[in-house]
C-alpha cells in the first residue's frame, strides 16, 4: 500500500487487484502520480478526487455519487475485494455547502479498511454502525474542506481502528489548498509512527492492538 498524496492511495491485494482511491491530477500537484489500476474508487465528483487521465489500464470505476450528485448504492466484489459505501456529507450542513460524500469500506481477506473521502462532519451512530469494525482508517485531517484535526480524532475514537492513515492535509508542492498540515493532527500524541518510504505492507497479524497513527510520506510514482 502507498499513499499517493492528498486522498489517493494505491493498494495491491493478495489476488493481485490494483486499487486506487480518489485520484488527483496536476491541478493539485505538478508531480501527480501516474499509476496502473484495475479498480478506482471515487468518493465524490470534485476535481481533486476524480482525475482519471493519469490512471492507466482499463479500470472499473466505482463512483460513490450518481451524476445527479446523489449517493450511489455500491455493494460490489472484484476478486478478493468486497466494497460498499456509506452515505455522508462533504460539509456540516447536510450537503448544502459542498454536496454529498461516500465513505468506501473495503473488505480484503480478513482486513477491513475505510476511506472517508472528503468527510465534512463527525459521524452519527447510524453511520458508525454501517461502517462497522475497521482495521485501517484513511481519514482527512486538514480541515477547511473537510473535518479538522479535532473532529478527526472524534471520528477515530468512534471507530476505534487499529491503524489511522491521515490524508487530505497540506504537503509541499500542493497548489492553492488552504488546509492544515498533519502536525495539527499528531500534536501531543504518543501513538504516532512515521514512514519515510511511503509504502507499507498490511497484514492483520502485524497490526497494533491499540490505535496507532501511521504518517506516510507521499509517494508519486509511475507504476
PLM features: what roles do these ranges have?
Residues 1-3, 18-22, 80-89, 105, ...:
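Active-site-proximal beta-strand elements of phosphoester/diester hydrolases
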Residues 26-30, 45-51, 121-124, 144-150, ...:
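Active-site environment of divalent metal-dependent phosphoester hydrolases
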Residues 89-159, 170:
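Active-site-proximal loop/helix segments of hydrolase catalytic cores
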Residues 72, 98, 163-223:
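Binuclear metal-ion centers of metallo-dependent hydrolases, dominated by the metallo-beta-lactamase
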Residues 8-71, 84-101, 119-130:
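Pre-active-site segment of Zn-dependent metallo-hydrolases
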Residues 11-14, 76-79, 106-109:
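Active-site beta-strand termini and strand-to-loop segments that position acidic
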Residues 37-38, 135, 162:
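Conserved acidic residues
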Residues 1-14, 18, 66-67, 206-208, ...:
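Zn-dependent metallo-beta-lactamase
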